[in-house]
């Protein structure tokens, strides 16, 4: 499986290679410019807008600029005029050496859309160098028997200029023995040969000298000179001869210094010193002399400087074998440099865009070029990025690539990407170059605020102070910057009757909720509303949450005594027969509390009594009963004060005062009589009062039944609009009783009244309350109405 994956990857790389080669062959049109070397920086080269047929403002709007593969900006583009100018002074000899023509390649990058234009700049040579002889003095040893027409090699002059500005001719100072003949070597260089015009005579002229002058073809021409000394030697009539007239050898460019490249060999038929051969490099350029060395005795050619295939691919060297008599032979050695994969690919970034918006696909992030100066497979390259990134590489002309987003990005998932661009050649071993870049993702408003809870429940005690902080809501936004800044607001309530604007307010910055006024549990137990969270993006996004506010009851209402009605001018009087048994029900104190829960749990106790121990009050229902048998010695009149107390904190209380009259029977009530009143008058008055009392009780019973029915119907019609309340759960103290119905002032209190006529004690019982909660004003009114039931004896019902 591993071999199969490797093979697949190799096939993909080969396909990408063919695509790149095809695109490079089908590149866009090339525009050529020409400029002479040594021109000052800022010199005009050409007008790009005119040549391309574009308007100058289009070059500016598309961000046109000049880029090059060698990372040196030798040209600059004036986007205001479209002129291409020199950024530096160009030296043709430094840039191209002996290569002619000297052409530099540039690209013009334009964006929106991305476009590459190929530019060739030809650097024209000027005659700024004079011919130079490496040796200012040459020594020639010529045998005297050299025939007329014999040719002798002279060292050639070096001129860094090319073309017509290179060395064109050689001359020598006038003499009668020699003239100059021009030759061209394999490197297309001209070199001089000295031709013998007149036989030499050692005895007549053992030595002669003349000036050798090299002239170039410039205008005006430049020249260089060297002194030639000719020493006439005696009879040496055999020249050295090489085994081969031409040698060819191939060596890798990474050969170590000092390694043996080739050994040349020559022989001379002469004997003695005339047969001794000396090997030298003839007409060698400076590069050859720096790179190679020949052993003068053995003919071994060794490497003295590193080779670089990318700089010079081959060398042609003339080896000269000279004997002691001055005769020589020559052979040509061609050294072919073999390329090795010693150069890693290079990446040149032309432009980069960061940050990029998160929701825009196919955005150009980077424009870059790649190259490998090796040759063959060593110079073929493939480019890749990790597959798990939402980016894609797209190739362009001349090894240019664009890095683009493959799909919309999500900043909330990944805020930045570290991208490694890997460029690998196909040499052995493979060399690669990695370029790391960080791309930041800018935020767009694509996330609405989110509340930490879908609903909030807040508890507020009633009677709170205005502007009280009752709670907070919180929302977060996954975006960043202003897109994540949240503003809070109150939304219009669904219930149009809810005065939300006067109840609560919200801090727009932090979501704190405040009660605007004091709340009353008895008026409003609970309410709910919705809050909104809106970010500051464009367009703004929002969300909402439900807030429920529950008002907690406080013990702010004292118990209210319903029965007996408290009227300072007409206190309640109860009749008790002296024959009553212990536990006889005298009356029942009925009270209510406007609060709820334990604040409405009431307990009763006898606070004061005329005769302690005679009467008792049941703590849980307020019933007043006799505690023992009555006797004739007990006083006829008794005043009882009953304390009604709730279970709040702190507790609130009320008192009920009632008068008890002990009588021998209901037919003979004991009442104080005027001293002159006759007995018959007492009987008549008692009968009248009993009739009035019976009528009052009957009317009160009938009125209670009607009131019960009316309250039932009213409660049923208002059940939907009345807010719910919480009722304390669990057991409560046995001495307490909740007489508040459902525990709220908005509920009605209902009492059923029953007078047991058949019992021995004729008890008057209140079984269940059935009257609405009475406010302060109503209390006085009810007291006035109930005062009509009193008679002259002080009885009331």
Curated annotation (Swiss-Prot):
Pfam families: Cadherin, Cadherin_2, Cadherin_C_2
Membrane-topology annotation of the record: Single-pass type I membrane protein
Glycan attachment positions: 418, 436, 487, 567
GO cellular component, as recorded: plasma membrane
Matching SUPFAM superfamilies: Cadherin-like
Taxonomy, superkingdom: Eukaryota
Signal sequence interval, chain numbering: 1-26
Subcellular location: Cell membrane
Major subcellular location class: membrane
All ranges on the Extracellular side of the membrane: 27-690
GO terms of molecular function: calcium ion binding
Positions in the Cytoplasmic compartment: 712-797
Keyword Cell inner membrane: no
Ranges for domain Cadherin: 35-133, 138-242, 247-347, 352-451, 456-561, 568-671
Listed InterPro entries: Cadherin-like_dom, Cadherin-like_sf, Cadherin_C, Cadherin_CS, Cadherin_N, Protocadherin/Cadherin-CA
Transmembrane segments: 691-711
Keywords for this protein: Calcium, Cell adhesion, Cell membrane, Glycoprotein, Membrane, Repeat, Signal, Transmembrane, Transmembrane helix
GO biological process: cell adhesion; homophilic cell adhesion via plasma membrane adhesion molecules; nervous system development
Role played: Potential calcium-dependent cell-adhesion protein. May be involved in the establishment and maintenance of specific neuronal connections in the brain.
UniProt cross-references to PANTHER family, sorted A to Z: CADHERIN-87A, PROTOCADHERIN BETA-11
Protein name: Protocadherin beta-11
């Amino acid at each position: 499986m591993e071999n199969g994956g490797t093979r697949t990857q190799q096939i993909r790389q080969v396909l990408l290679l063919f695509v790149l080669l095809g695109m490079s062959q089908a590149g866009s049109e090339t525009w050529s410019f020409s400029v002479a070397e040594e021109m000052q920086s800022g010199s005009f080269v050409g007008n790009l807008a005119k040549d391309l047929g574009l308007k100058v403002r289009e070059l500016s709007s598309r961000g046109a600029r000049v880029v090059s593969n060698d990372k040196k900006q030798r040209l600059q583009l004036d986007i205001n005029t479209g002129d291409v100018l020199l950024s530096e002074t160009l030296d043709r000899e430094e840039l191209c050496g002996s290569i002619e023509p000297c052409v530099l390649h540039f690209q013009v990058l334009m964006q929106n859309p991305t476009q590459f234009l190929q530019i060739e700049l030809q650097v024209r040579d000027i005659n700024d160098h004079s011919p130079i002889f490496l040796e200012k003095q040459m020594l020639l040893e010529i045998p005297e028997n050299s025939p007329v027409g014999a040719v002798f090699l002279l060292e050639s002059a070096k001129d860094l200029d090319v073309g017509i500005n290179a060395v064109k001719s050689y001359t020598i100072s006038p003499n009668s023995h020699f003239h100059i003949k021009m030759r061209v070597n394999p490197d297309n260089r001209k070199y001089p040969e000295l031709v013998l015009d007149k036989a030499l005579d050692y005895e007549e002229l053992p030595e002669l000298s003349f000036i050798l002058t090299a002239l170039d073809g410039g205008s005006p021409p430049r020249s260089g000179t060297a002194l030639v000394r000719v020493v006439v030697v005696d009879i040496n009539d055999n020249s050295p001869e090489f085994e081969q007239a031409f040698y060819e050898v191939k060596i890798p460019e990474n050969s170590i210094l000092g390694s043996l490249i080739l050994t040349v060999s020559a022989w001379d038929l002469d004997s003695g010193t005339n047969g001794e051969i000396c090997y030298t490099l003839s007409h060698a350029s400076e590069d050859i002399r720096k790179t190679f060395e020949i052993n003068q005795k053995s003919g071994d050619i060794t490497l003295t400087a590193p080779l670089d295939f990318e700089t010079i691919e081959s060398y042609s060297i003339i080896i000269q074998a000279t004997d002691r008599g001055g005769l020589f032979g020559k052979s040509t050695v061609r050294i072919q440099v073999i390329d090795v994969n010693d150069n890693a690919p290079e990446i040149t970034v032309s432009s980069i865009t960061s940050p990029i918006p998160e929701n825009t696909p196919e955005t150009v992030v980077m424009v870059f070029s790649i190259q490998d100066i090796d040759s063959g497979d060593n110079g073929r390259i493939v480019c890749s990025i990790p597959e798990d990134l939402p980016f894609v590489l797209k190739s362009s002309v001349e090894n240019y690539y664009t890095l683009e987003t493959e799909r919309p990005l999500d900043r909330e998932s990944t805020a930045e990407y570290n991208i490694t661009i890997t460029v690998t050649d196909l040499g052995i071993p493979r060399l690669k170059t990695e370029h790391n870049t960080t791309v930041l993702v800018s935020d767009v408003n694509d996330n609405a605020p989110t509340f930490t809870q879908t609903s909030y429940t807040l508890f507020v005690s009633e009677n709170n102070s205005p502007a009280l902080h009752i709670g907070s809501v919180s929302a977060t936004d996954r975006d960043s910057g202003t897109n994540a800044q949240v503003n809070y607001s109150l939304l219009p309530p669904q219930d149009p009757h809810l005065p939300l604007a006067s109840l609560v307010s919200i801090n727009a910055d932090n979501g704190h909720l405040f009660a605007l006024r004091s709340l009353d549990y008895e008026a409003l137990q609970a309410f709910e509303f919705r809050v909104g969270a809106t970010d500051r993006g464009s367009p703004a996004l929002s969300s909402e949450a439900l807030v429920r506010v529950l008002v907690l009851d406080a013990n702010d209402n004292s118990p209210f005594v319903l029965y007996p009605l408290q009227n300072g001018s007409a206190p309640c009087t109860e009749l008790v027969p002296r024959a009553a048994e212990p536990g006889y029900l005298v009356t029942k104190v009925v009270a209510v509390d406007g609060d709820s829960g334990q604040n409405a749990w009431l307990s009763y106790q006898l606070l004061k009594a005329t005769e302690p121990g005679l009467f008792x009050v049941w703590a849980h229902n307020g019933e007043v009963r006799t505690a023992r048998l009555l006797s004739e010695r007990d006083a006829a009149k008794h005043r009882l004060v009953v304390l009604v107390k709730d279970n709040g904190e702190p507790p609130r209380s009320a008192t009920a005062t009632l008068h008890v009259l002990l009588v021998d029977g209901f037919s003979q009530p004991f009442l104080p009589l005027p001293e002159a009143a006759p007995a018959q008058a007492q009987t008549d008055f008692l009968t009248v009062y009993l009739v009035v009392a019976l009528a009052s009780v009957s009317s009160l019973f009938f009125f209670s039944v009607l009131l019960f029915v009316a309250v039932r119907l009213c409660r049923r019609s208002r059940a939907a609009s009345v807010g719910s309340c919480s009722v304390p759960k669990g057991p409560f103290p046995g001495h307490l009783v909740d007489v508040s119905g459902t525990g709220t002032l908005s509920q009605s209190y209902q009492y059923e009244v029953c007078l047991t006529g058949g019992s021995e004690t004729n008890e008057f019982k209140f079984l269940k309350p059935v009257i609405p909660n009475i406010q302060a004003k109503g209390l006085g009114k009810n007291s006035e109405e109930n005062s009509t039931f009193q008679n002259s004896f002080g009885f009331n019902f």
